[in-house]
Amino acid sequence: MRAVICGAGVIGASIAYFLTRRGVKPIIVERTGIACAASGKSGGILARHWCDGTPSQQLARHSFDLHAQLAGDSREDWGYRRVTTYGGSGSARTQTRHTSQNPIGWVSAQIDVGQQLGSTEDTAQVHPALFTTAMMRAAQSQGAELRIGTVTGVKQAAGRVSGVEVDGALIEADAVIIAMGPWSILAAAWLPLPAVYGLKGHSLVFETGAAIPPEALFLEFHEAGGAVQSPEFFPRPDGTIYVCAISSDNPLPIHPAAVAPDPGAIERLERICAAVSPALASADIVARQACFRPIARDGLPLIGRVPGVTGAYIATGHSVWGILNAPATGEAMAELILDRATRRVDLAPFDPRRLKPLNPAQLRFGAG
């Protein structure tokens, strides 16, 4: 089996990992670097039950369990730990001090943390970039090969894939897996695939200089100008705190390296953080960043065979749950490619055939 994976984010790395566990030595083609986009700039929260009642329930539950198994089996440290998660509210326009004791000690008295959303039984976290890199490194140790280059086409012969064009050269393949996050939309010019969109989000990483308890916080926060944001705060075991908020629908640039924060978005997020926590108001900021999360038209991932082209597969569109669902996606894709069926997760809800293929003439990108 000659397999080529297009994309070295968390989904591509996870597919490579599980393929190598079955004896396949895939080639992973990446034009920028491992975890260069959302896989390296997301929060890394894991929740076992938060997709319950949706078509992603089985995928999320199994993937949560796989995360624990992978962390237990590996000698590498990618920041996996169980966390307690809370929900609350706050406003930049009020100085009201809540008389009840907040369960989180590092937030301002003006923040009302009134709900526990998850416990160490069902919520956890990883450092996304470290996890993705570790999965890729494990795959490489079993024979996978990472090549830096730009995929420019998928070659076909007699209704099946025959290879991938990379910077003008052909890599022969029996299986081609598109796992390029929101840039998977580029593959609609080569294969009959539905559209994948990018939802932009902004984030900060603070260096607090002290260990913060494993407590994740989800807020509804009213800015001084009246806008309502939903910032998320994830302390990490390395002494940093990751915070994200402020989404936008700005167009996806054609190259991942061209992604940059929207004007004013980082400053707004810094003001929110200063209002929420004195620890953040005085902490150094070690990363100011933005990324695009991949989303399909109906909000569900695209995982499965590309219709009408034998040997072509896609795995993308996981939205905010890409880190959570990567292990189960990687395992299921390896089963689908090698066994033609999956054992633990039913991929029917994510079949690309449920959505109409995109007309390549409609492809549009932002600057870069």
Predicted regions and their residues:
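N-terminal Rossmann-like FAD-binding beta1-loop-alpha1 element of flavoenzymes
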Residues: 2-27
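Active-site substrate-recognition segment that forms the wall
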Residues: 17-18, 44-46, 78-82, 180-308
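Predominantly flavin-linked oxidoreductase catalytic cores and closely associated redox partners
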Residues: 127-213
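Conserved Rossmann-like nucleotide-cofactor binding loop
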Residues: 11, 34, 183
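Flavin (FAD/FMN) cofactor-binding and adjacent substrate-gating region
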Residues: 69-149, 153-160, 295
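Short loop/edge segments at beta-strand edges and connector loops
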Residues: 30, 148-150, 287
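C-terminal catalytic lobe of FAD-dependent flavoproteins
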Residues: 277-368
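Conserved FAD-binding subdomain of flavin-dependent enzymes
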Residues: 18-21, 31-85, 93-101, 224
